[in-house]
Amino acid sequence: MTKQNAFTREDLLRCSRGELFGPGNAQLPAPNMLMVDRITHISEEGGKYGKGELVAELDITPDLWFFACHFEGDPVMPGCLGLDAMWQLVGFFLGWQGLPGRGRALGSGEVKFFGQVLPTAKKVTYNIQIKRVLKGKLNLAIADGSVSVDGREIYTAEGLRVGVFTSTDNF
């Protein structure tokens, strides 16, 4: 059976409700924290490290919730939302691979911001390059990611780490 390699907004909303990978497994956040409209490509092969990659997009409109409050008179998408979107996608990758448990961001290495998303932008593109997937007692993915706005790279993150846990009682 061939794995689905692209996901629509409705697919991602199903994932936020726990319906895509099953109860107790990886979920995306619900809107407003869902920072992705579609995954245009996901693969467990290829990419910069040969371990898999994801490409996803967020459509930008001036009425997105964060522009009204960050900042009044100087609207810009918070950089932390782009970083969170990259963690969301690494967790999605683990669920897509069939690894059980609830996703949790575990950290990252170096993060750089050198651009911004303004209300005049049209599209944000996320590019995730999987470096390593550990399967066993701990299921964990390590990836590098970038965020581009209208084709121009504006953020990078190295060593994004996300794990999936069958119990989060002691987390």
Curated annotation (Swiss-Prot):
Belongs to the thioester dehydratase family. FabA subfamily. Pathway: Lipid metabolism; fatty acid biosynthesis. HAMAP family: FabA. It holds the Pfam family FabA. The keyword Ion transport does not apply. Its EC number is 4.2.1.59, 5.3.3.14. GO terms for molecular function: (3R)-hydroxyacyl-[acyl-carrier-protein] dehydratase activity; trans-2-decenoyl-acyl-carrier-protein isomerase activity. This is 3-hydroxydecanoyl-[acyl-carrier-protein] dehydratase. The keyword rRNA-binding does not apply.
